Amino acid sequence: KLVVVFGATGAQGGSVARTLLEDGTFRVRVVTRNPEQKLLADLAKRLGLHYVVYSGLENIKKLAAGHFDGKGEVEEYFRKPEEYIGQNVGLSTCRTTPEEYEKLGFQGAQDLANMFRFYALKPDRNIDLTLRAQTLDQWLEQHKGDFAHL
């Protein structure tokens, strides 16, 4: 019988995998979220690991670090407010400094870090100007004649 053990580098999963292997009547496959653990490497060497399947997908939660999740929640609210009226909506963020942010290494991280520095220096906002801001659709409608020759 073939048995797949998930969480094999944890205490419970590791124990299950070892017990099944020691029994000798089972073929065992193990799955782990962290293939870089020393315990896994030692176990693989000891047992004569035959295959490693590695997923090359990036960990999007690590890359984005949750910085834009709140923006997405707010956007959803504005698109479908009737679904959120009277509901509790949880928004959270971390306290990342501009220096930490620019080290994230994605394209535009330095620009965003500089924007955060600017906002920290000038916390006052011109609310009247903000209220006059247009959506892209409004601006395009107002300026569509400017694009007629293109």
Curated annotation (Swiss-Prot):
ATP-binding listed as a keyword: no
Any Gene Ontology CC annotation: perinuclear region of cytoplasm
Keywords associated with the record: Cytoplasm, NADP, Nucleus
Key word Nucleus present: yes
Subcellular location: Cytoplasm; Cytoplasm, Perinuclear region; Nucleus
Domain of life: Eukaryota
Gene Ontology molecular function terms on file: identical protein binding
Residues bound to NADP(+): G7, A8, T9, G10, A11, Q12, R33, N34, P35, E36, Q37, K71
Primary location group: cytoplasm
Description of how the protein assembles with itself and partners: Homodimer. Interacts with ASS1. Interaction is enhanced by low NADPH/NADP(+) ratios, which results in inhibition of ASS1 activity.
Similarity comment: family membership: Belongs to the NmrA-type oxidoreductase family.
Biological function: Redox sensor protein. Undergoes restructuring and subcellular redistribution in response to changes in intracellular NADPH/NADP(+) levels. At low NADPH concentrations the protein is found mainly as a monomer, and binds argininosuccinate synthase (ASS1), the enzyme involved in nitric oxide synthesis. Association with ASS1 impairs its activity and reduces the production of nitric oxide, which subsecuently prevents apoptosis. Under normal NADPH concentrations, the protein is found as a dimer and hides the binding site for ASS1. The homodimer binds one molecule of NADPH.
Name of the protein in question: NmrA-like family domain-containing protein 1
